[in-house]
Regions:
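C-terminal membrane-cytosol helix-exit motif in multi-pass small-molecule transporters
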Residues: 1-14, 202-210
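Juxtamembrane intracellular "pre-TM" segments in multi-pass secondary transporters
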Residues: 8-36
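Pair of pore-lining "gating" transmembrane helices in MFS-fold secondary transporters
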Residues: 29-50, 131
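Short amphipathic helix-loop junctions that connect adjacent transmembrane helices
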Residues: 53-70
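Helix-to-loop junctions at the C-terminal end of transmembrane segments
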Residues: 85-98, 183
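Structural signature of the two symmetry-related core transmembrane helices
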Residues: 101-116, 193-196
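Paired small-residue
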Residues: 113, 124-132
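Intracellular juxtamembrane helix-capping segments at the cytosolic ends
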Residues: 139-152
């Protein structure tokens, strides 16, 4: 379908850009770009860190054994549903008040919402908190892409966006590994608290980048 129905106009870059190019070492705003790559990783890590423990954790919250798998599915889906609902709205808001500001607020909100997830007493409380966390995280991907587009020379946008996607896949890889390790060695509630600390550290880093950008 994509091959037959979509026609793309290819614009060759100017000769000067093609000849000169821009290497990673000469990339302007390298710190900002690295921060965005790490933020994309954190987004996936936050969503996937509970995957290894979710069924076992829900079992401690749900008395009816026949409902465990269903509630665990709701928990995993809730964050994605929240992100679907909020992504467009947060992207528009970021265009008005600043992408780095939204990223900082989103990471802070998600990090704080992870703390009560460690102390819930029912499966539906966990579903609600994961949904709210998804609402917060929904603005990250459009904001990350926008920051990269604004800070990277035209000839490198595709390359850096490729790194961004790779970082997100790395988060999908690291998240379950971290969740399984922490859950197995420390405890399931510690998974939520550890993920919270990581997201809040990411929020602090983005806030620092935002302050530095504002003073320039």
């Amino acid at each position: 379908m994509t091959l037959t129905l979509i026609r793309e106009e290819v614009h060759k870059p100017a000769d000067t850009v093609a000849k000169t190019g821009v290497s990673w070492s000469l990339l302007p705003a390298r710190t900002v770009i690295i921060c965005m790559l790490c933020t994309g990783l954190l987004l996936m890590l936050a969503n996937m860190s509970i995957e290894p423990i979710i069924t076992v954790y829900v079992r401690t919250l749900v008395s009816d054994a026949s409902q465990i798998t269903k509630v665990a599915g709701y928990v995993m889906a809730a964050a994605a549903l929240g992100s679907i609902i909020s992504a467009s709205w947060l992207g528009k808001l970021a265009d008005r008040i600043g992408h780095l500001r939204i990223i900082t607020l989103a990471l802070t909100a998600a990090g704080l919402l992870l703390i009560p997830q460690a102390f819930v007493t029912s499966g539906w409380q966990l579903v609600a908190l994961r949904f709210l966390m998804g609402l917060a995280l929904g603005g990250l991907l459009p904001c990350i892409a926008a920051v990269i587009r604004h800070r990277v020379p035209e000839g490198m946008v595709g390359s850096i966006l490729g790194y961004s996607v790779a970082a997100q896949f790395a988060g999908q890889f690291i998240g379950p590994l971290m969740g399984g390790f922490v859950g197995g060695h420390i405890g399931m509630r510690a998974v939520f608290l550890a993920t919270s600390c990581i997201l809040l550290a990411g929020a602090a880093w983005n806030f620092k980048i935002h302050r530095q950008s504002a003073t320039r």
